[in-house]
């Protein structure tokens, strides 16, 4: 090691000589031993002998630092005659080895869990196949005997033909779904096992006697990495070609049955004609040779550039805010650790499904050994599920919510980067104008970041590992069924409850839950079941929006004052909670034999009592629709048996979800925010409903929620809870469950489901959600049948009661439609006799079962009629009080008429000779015809009366909807309509949110807060922009410099750039090599799958087929793949270039997020990067599915 010459230099020992080799490097000759050495013999006296004695960046005796243009800085150990790329003074390599060993234990546990999950799915598939065969045999056997199949008796040995058909089709679809899931899981398991073995080999290789790679080995690995990268690049090009060929093949098939011809070419297809037209229009708009006035064109170009510049600046500001929000979220210890927790929860769910299918297995034609084996398997599963009772879930639910928030922010960030890239390209196309694009030269602009991105991917070691190799875009599609099941499994307390479902809310919390007071009834149950809570506190948005008056490049331009998001409830939270139900959910139940049950033609529809239930969420029509369309069962928005709330409906306004409980609390359904109802002294006293009244109700009732999602064509059925089960005499050894069927059944839709079994108690909380993938037109021709069944200790099933719901008038809105339904006993269900009896709830001459049921119904009818009378009297009294103050706002004669008719229908059979007032006309809203308490589903025959009265009513003054939070006018409207929850504090509530009731327009620009307004001048140092603290302006001074002059890069920036480069180790190099090999292997599998799919489609096309295979049409993964291929084929070269630029920008943004997280959470970037590298091997996302298995 040569040293600098100096006056105080020690002389060489006797017999030593200094020399230089052919490249000028200094070495030393020991003539005494006739040897040469690179080590200066004088270093023994001047340098430390070990690393423990080193100070600062000092190297010990025998060590030297070198530089290689390909590798960079490396270190030489002259004593052992070795080289290495790690810095021997740092302990980073040891920390890497420790993290690798820790992750191996975590990955081994995850692999074991997924193998067990695969085994449980195999058991379910075998059981479903066996049950499918048995059901087919039973159908053939029963269909041969007409009397046995269509017998009207309720014996459990008979089959209902409709239920049996639905059972067979559902089992068949379950078999196909399990086959697809097992095929995908098998491939994922293979990839994860390979990745785990690779990590084990790396750990064994790098933690043994081998200390690290030498310089020559590192160079060889880099050369191999470059060759692998070239192979991967060529493979990606081949993948794009295969995707384009798939798009062309798909175009030749007839996806739509109405189209009778095939398109020979993708570019000439009518599907893409609008795309071609839009591109031509876009290209024409960007030409500069358009004839016309040059002045007009230049002014239009200038206005367009200003508009695009403002949008571009706003997009960059939004991107910066999203980066800050992402960096503030707590990062998980290991990437993918949350996926392991999800798989454990899904394993519990799969075991529950297997247990439920074993409970409903058909016992007929099975040997005694098979029955004993099935019983032993059931007991084993019950014990395993009981053992996870103490598993905590509150912290896991919070982590899952953070993960969902992170995914949402990442998706927004990706969309923002695409928008930014698009706007940048549009600004470049308009750069011929005289107006310069100031944003392109500003700090953090896309132009500067794009240049840095190009320089960061030049084949260096860092680029190969963190930027190019381990970056994965957000293109991984998550199975919505999987996600929704996971959300539904999350519970508020902890553990598994065998007698009830895994849910986040218990039965007593439905009525009065201190933890979630803003959720009650089914709304609260559903929101809690999906693990939904109000979103996390987001970073406050800019208080001022971009103002066109400011021509300066300001950080936060002036604008109107805004109220912070956390100050008052927003309507988006309710949309987010409802969005939880848009996830697809399909419960795979197993078949069993059923009893013959006659269909229900009529039923009583009662609303919720104080046991805690929810109102229906239905969207009001306008007045014309109210007069034309029949009333459906969801119009009962005001529950009679609960404390009354006045709901004033306006045109185009959605109804409010009102839920009442014992504690007199209500929920604002449109915002999802709890607010206690404050009774005013001027308001009337509410009709109290005590818990003792529950004992009067002797009819079993079930709470059912319905919802249709038009976007995903999914019909959601929610079995919430059951009450008054004591109406049926059920042995304590038996258990009860609900059987849900959508009839008539379809062969391509799962239409029969079962809930979990529960021991018989007075009230049971189910919270089971089922999904039916069906179109809206097909759903309107279906009937929902819900049966309450019991299963004995000897696995003998019996249908106790049931109800039927017509789906012809189902409100197709984005809200949950919830009502209570009476369960009529199977022996008591009326059959359809003639048309005049269809509108009646109870037939006048209908015989009752016994005197107990007669007394129960009589008491219920008496209580209902008395409550109706009380409501009429209160409304009449209210009208008399308000008649002298204001004119009526709408007729309520129709409302009272419907009340009287409903009451007459209910009490037609028995007692209650109660006369209702004839001349009662209370003031109520125009849309009150759609809010009828205690109205049954057959109340649509009153439509003509409602329409007649509405047409005959003279035009009245319509209430005006006023947003009190944003209104700045002092003049109040006397005819203003406010929701009941806003009635308590109408004027006092707005003041805490508004900064000043009087806006002074003399303030600068706008009345925003002055302390949040920052104006930065992007000008030279003239007297108009000189700060007050500086010296006075002196002309011709040397300090007068323009900010547009490009200054030289200071040394601090260079030092920061070199410090940001992470330290590379041999372990990093080995991980990069193995990850590249893994990526190449998986890419080859994807290419092979694409080739097989193309070959299959070409063979079908050659055979004259005009439709895609059924397995491809039914599999959502193939549908996503074909859509992606079609989208890529439609992209032009410019759009593809924009996509690549957006991807590069997204990589740069991800680096910025890591840097910000390092500053905020003190997590070193090198630790984050290394964890991502390790997790890459055990993440197996199958983007290209294999060909589906044969159908059943």
Curated annotation (Swiss-Prot):
Residues 875-885 have a biased composition (Acidic residues). Regulator of the Hippo signaling pathway, also known as the Salvador-Warts-Hippo (SWH) pathway. Enhances phosphorylation of LATS1 and YAP1 and negatively regulates cell proliferation and organ growth due to a suppression of the transcriptional activity of YAP1, the major effector of the Hippo pathway. Residues 441-462, 873-895, 911-991, 1124-1143 are annotated as: Disordered. The lineage of its organism: Eukaryota, Metazoa, Chordata, Craniata, Vertebrata. PANTHER family: BOMB/KIRA PROTEINS, PROTEIN WWC2. One of its GO terms (molecular function) is molecular adaptor activity. Transmembrane segments: none annotated. InterPro entries: C2_dom, C2_domain_sf, C2_WWC, WW_dom, WW_dom_sf, WWC/KIBRA_Hippo_Reg. The modification Phosphothreonine is found at residue 1004. It comes from the Eukaryota. Residues 698-821 form the C2 domain. Residues 923-933 have a biased composition (Polar residues). GO terms for biological process: cell migration; hippo signaling; negative regulation of cell population proliferation; negative regulation of hippo signaling; negative regulation of organ growth; negative regulation of transcription by RNA polymerase II; regulation of DNA-templated transcription; regulation of hippo signaling. The keyword Transcription regulation applies. The gene is WWC2. Forms homodimers and heterodimers with WWC1 and WWC3. Interacts with DLC1 and PRKCZ. Interacts (via WW domains) with LATS1 and LATS2. Residues 938-951, 1124-1137 have a biased composition (Basic and acidic residues). The modification Phosphoserine is found at residues 286, 1022. Residues 121-194, 224-256, 302-421, 859-887, 1068-1144 form a coiled coil. CDD domains: C2_Kibra (cd08680), WW (cd00201). This is Protein WWC2. Residues 10-43, 57-90 form the WW domain. Belongs to the WWC family. Its main location: cytoplasm. Residues 1031-1050 are annotated as: Interaction with PRKCZ. Keywords: Coiled coil, Cytoplasm, Phosphoprotein, Repeat, Repressor, Transcription, Transcription regulation.
């Amino acid at each position: 090691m040569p040293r600098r010459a100096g006056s105080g230099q020690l002389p060489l020992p006797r017999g030593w000589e200094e020399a230089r080799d052919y490249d000028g490097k200094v070495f030393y000759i020991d003539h005494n031993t006739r040897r040469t050495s690179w080590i200066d013999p004088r270093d023994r006296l001047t340098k430390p002998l070990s690393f423990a004695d080193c100070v600062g960046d000092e190297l010990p005796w025998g060590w030297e630092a070198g530089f290689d243009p390909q590798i960079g800085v490396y270190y030489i150990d002259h004593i052992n005659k070795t080289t290495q790329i790690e810095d021997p003074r740092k302990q980073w390599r040891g920390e890497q080895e420790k993290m690798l060993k820790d992750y191996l234990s975590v990955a081994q546990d995850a692999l074991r869990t997924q193998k067990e999950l695969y085994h449980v799915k195999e058991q379910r598939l075998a059981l479903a196949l066996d049950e499918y065969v048995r059901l087919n045999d039973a159908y053939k056997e029963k269909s041969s005997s007409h009397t046995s199949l269509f017998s009207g008796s309720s014996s459990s040995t008979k089959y209902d033909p409709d239920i049996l058909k639905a059972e067979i089709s559902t089992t068949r679809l379950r078999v196909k779904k399990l086959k697809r899931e097992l095929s995908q899981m098998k491939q994922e398991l293979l990839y994860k096992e390979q990745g785990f073995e690779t990590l084990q080999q790396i750990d064994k290789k790098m933690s043994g006697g081998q200390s690290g790679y030498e310089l020559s080995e590192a160079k060889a690995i880099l050369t191999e990495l470059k060759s692998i990268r070239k192979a991967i690049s060529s493979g990606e090009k081949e993948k794009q070609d295969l995707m384009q060929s798939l798009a062309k093949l798909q175009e030749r098939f007839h996806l739509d049955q109405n189209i009778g011809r095939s398109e020979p070419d993708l570019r000439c297809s009518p599907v893409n004609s609008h795309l071609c037209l839009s591109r031509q229009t876009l290209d024409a708009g960007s030409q500069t040779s358009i004839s016309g006035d040059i002045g007009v064109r230049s002014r239009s170009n200038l206005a367009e550039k200003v508009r695009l510049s403002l949008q571009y600046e706003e997009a960059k500001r939004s991107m910066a805010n999203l980066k800050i929000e992402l960096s503030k979220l707590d990062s998980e210890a290991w990437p993918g650790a949350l996926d392991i927790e999800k798989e454990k929860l899904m394993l519990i769910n799969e075991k529950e499904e297997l247990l439920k299918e074993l409970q409903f297995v058909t016992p007929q034609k099975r040997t005694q050994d098979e029955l004993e084996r099935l019983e032993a398997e059931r007991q084993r599963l019950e014990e395993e599920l009981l053992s996870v009772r103490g598993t905590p879930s509150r912290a896991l639910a919070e982590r899952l919510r953070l993960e969902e928030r992170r995914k949402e922010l990442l998706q927004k960030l990706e969309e923002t980067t695409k928008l930014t890239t698009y706007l940048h390209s549009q600004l470049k196309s308009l750069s011929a104008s005289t107006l310069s694009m100031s944003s392109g030269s500003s700090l953090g602009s896309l132009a500067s970041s794009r240049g840095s991105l190009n320089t960061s991917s030049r084949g260096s070691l860092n680029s190969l590992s963190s930027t190019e190799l381990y970056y994965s875009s957000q293109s991984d599609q998550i199975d919505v069924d999987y996600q929704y099941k996971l959300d539904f499994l999350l519970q508020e307390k902890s553990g598994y409850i065998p007698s009830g479902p895994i849910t986040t809310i218990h039965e007593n919390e439905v009525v009065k839950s201190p933890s979630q007071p803003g959720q009650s009834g089914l709304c609260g149950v559903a929101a809690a079941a999906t693990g939904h809570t109000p979103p996390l506190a987001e970073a406050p948005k800019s208080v001022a929006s971009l103002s066109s008056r400011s021509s300066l490049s300001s950080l936060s331009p002036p604008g109107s004052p805004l109220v912070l998001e956390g100050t008052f409830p927003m309507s988006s939270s309710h949309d987010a909670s409802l969005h939880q139900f848009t996830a697809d959910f399909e419960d795979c139940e197993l078949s069993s034999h059923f009893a013959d049950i006659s269909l229900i033609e009529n039923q009583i529809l009662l609303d919720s009592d104080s046991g805690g239930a929810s109102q229906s969420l239905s969207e009001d029509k306008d007045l014309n629709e109210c007069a034309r369309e029949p009333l459906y069962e969801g119009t009962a928005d005001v529950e009679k048996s609960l404390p009354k709330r006045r709901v004033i409906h306006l045109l185009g306004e959605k109804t409010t979800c009102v839920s009442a409980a014992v504690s007199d609390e209500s929920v604002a359904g449109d915002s999802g925010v709890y607010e206690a109802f404050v009774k005013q002294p001027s308001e009337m006293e509410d009709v109290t409903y005590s818990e003792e009244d529950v004992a009067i109700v002797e009819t079993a009732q079930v709470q059912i929620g319905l919802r249709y999602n038009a976007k995903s064509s999914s019909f959601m059925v929610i079995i919430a809870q059951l009450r008054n089960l004591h109406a049926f005499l059920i042995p304590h050894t038996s258990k009860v469950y609900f059987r849900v069927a959508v009839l008539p059944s379809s062969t391509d839709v799962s239409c029969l489901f079962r809930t979990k079994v529960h021991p018989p108690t007075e009230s049971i909380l189910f919270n089971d959600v089922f999904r039916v993938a069906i179109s809206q037109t097909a759903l309107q021709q279906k009937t929902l049948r819900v049966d309450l069944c019991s299963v004995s200790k000897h696995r003998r099933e019996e249908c106790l009661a049931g109800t039927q719901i017509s789906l012809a008038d189902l409100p197709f809105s984005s809200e949950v439609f919830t009502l209570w339904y009476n369960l009529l006993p199977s022996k008591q269900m009326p059959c359809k006799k003639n048309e005049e009896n269809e509108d009646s709830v109870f037939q006048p001459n209908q015989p009752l079962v016994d005197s107990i049921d007669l007394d129960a119904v009589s008491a219920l009818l008496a209580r209902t009629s008395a409550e109706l009378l009380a409501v009429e009297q209160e409304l009449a009294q209210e009208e008399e009080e308000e008649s002298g103050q204001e004119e009526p706002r709408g007729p309520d004669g129709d409302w009272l008429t419907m009340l009287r008719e409903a009451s007459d229908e209910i009490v037609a059979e028995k007692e209650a000779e109660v006369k209702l007032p004839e001349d009662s006309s209370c003031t109520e809203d125009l849309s009150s015809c759609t809010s009828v308490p205690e109205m049954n589903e057959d109340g649509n025959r009153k439509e003509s009366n409602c329409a007649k009265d509405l047409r005959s009513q003279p035009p009245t003054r319509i209430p005006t909807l006023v947003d009190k939070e944003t209104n700045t006018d002092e003049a109040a409207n006397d005819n203003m309509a406010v929701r009941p929850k806003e009635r308590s504090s109408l004027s006092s509530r707005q003041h805490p949110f508004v900064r000043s009731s009087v806006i002074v327009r003399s303030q600068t620009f706008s009345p925003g807060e002055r302390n949040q307004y920052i104006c930065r001048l992007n000008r030279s140092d003239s007297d108009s922009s000189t700060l007050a603290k500086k010296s006075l302006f002196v002309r011709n001074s040397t300090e007068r410099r323009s900010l547009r002059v490009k200054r030289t890069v200071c040394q601090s920036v260079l030092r920061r750039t070199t410090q940001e480069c992470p330290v590379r180790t041999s372990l990093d190099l080995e991980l990069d090599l193995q990850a590249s090999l893994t990526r190449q292997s998986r890419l080859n599998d994807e290419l092979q799958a694409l080739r097989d799919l193309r070959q299959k489609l070409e063979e079908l096309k050659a055979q004259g087929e005009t439709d895609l295979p059924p397995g491809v049409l039914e599999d959502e993964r193939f549908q996503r793949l074909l859509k992606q291929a079609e989208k890529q084929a439609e992209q032009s070269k410019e759009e593809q270039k924009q996509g690549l630029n957006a991807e590069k920008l997204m990589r740069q943004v991800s680096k910025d997020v890591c840097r910000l997280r390092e500053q905020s959470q003190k997590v070193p970037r090198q630790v984050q990067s290394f964890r991502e590298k390790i997790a890459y091997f055990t993440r197996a996302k199958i983007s290209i599915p294999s060909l589906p298995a044969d159908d059943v």
